[in-house]
């Protein structure tokens, strides 16, 4: 494959990053009620067709696109001044995203059944003892979120140091990646916080801007500058 084609495919792959931000932004606009404080409202919410379609085509699909975009970003950074950091960050971020996608898939297809049981008057589910599967799910989600945060922060730093991508697109990517995770940690506190705090859509906006900036920078750049010779630092 020629250098122009390789560069073009990298740029197309990078479009997965802003698309992930767009889909996740719309997914966060109508958050589900907190099951710990409003279980009945939560049960009604998760049994709607809207819930399943939103999770499947916004949250889950968005994360799949983020994985493709992360692979493209790591490949593009490989020949830059921050090539090693970019590849390590790519591996960490992708692994974390895959772990989180496992939990997202469970939520998409199992929570509607759980909510339906409550609406049908079958309340014994909430009184059942905790088993290994539930503990493993929470641990998987926690590890996934941590790896996503670490990997994406390192990706942003690699973009800043690369010399081949706009520095501030990396800074936006770091901020956009950190805000949703910090918001989700805040939501877990026992203070009756919103299940999806405002930091989540705010972070998604930053990811859209930062990801689109990176993709545009690659797609508009001459192929020779992006492959081989393209690893040369660009004047900021």
Q: Which role fits each region the language model picked out?
A:
Residues 1-236:
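Hydrophobic, aromatic-enriched alpha-helical segments typical of multi-pass transmembrane helices
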């Amino acid at each position: 494959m020629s250098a122009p084609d390789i560069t073009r495919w990298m740029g197309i792959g990078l479009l997965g990053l802003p698309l992930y931000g767009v889909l996740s932004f719309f997914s966060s606009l109508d958050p589900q009620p907190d099951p710990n404080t409003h279980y009945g409202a939560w049960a009604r919410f998760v049994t709607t067709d809207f819930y399943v379609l939103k999770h499947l085509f916004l949250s889950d699909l968005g994360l799949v696109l983020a994985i493709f975009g992360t692979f493209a970003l790591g490949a593009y950074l490989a020949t830059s001044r921050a090539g090693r950091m970019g590849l390590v960050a790519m591996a960490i971020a992708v692994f974390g995203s895959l772990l989180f996608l496992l939990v997202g898939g469970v939520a998409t297809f199992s929570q509607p059944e759980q909510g339906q049981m409550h609406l049908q008057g079958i309340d014994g589910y909430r009184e059942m003892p905790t088993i290994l599967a539930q503990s493993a799910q929470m641990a998987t989600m926690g590890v996934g979120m941590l790896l996503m945060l670490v990997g994406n922060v390192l990706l942003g730093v690699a973009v800043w140091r690369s010399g081949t991508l706009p520095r501030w697109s990396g800074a936006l990517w770091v901020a956009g990646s950190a805000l949703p995770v910090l918001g989700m940690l805040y939501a877990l506190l026992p203070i009756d916080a919103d299940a999806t705090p405002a930091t989540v859509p705010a972070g998604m906006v930053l990811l859209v801007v930062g990801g689109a900036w990176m993709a545009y920078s690659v797609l508009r750049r001459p192929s020779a500058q992006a492959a081989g010779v393209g690893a040369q630092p660009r004047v900021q």
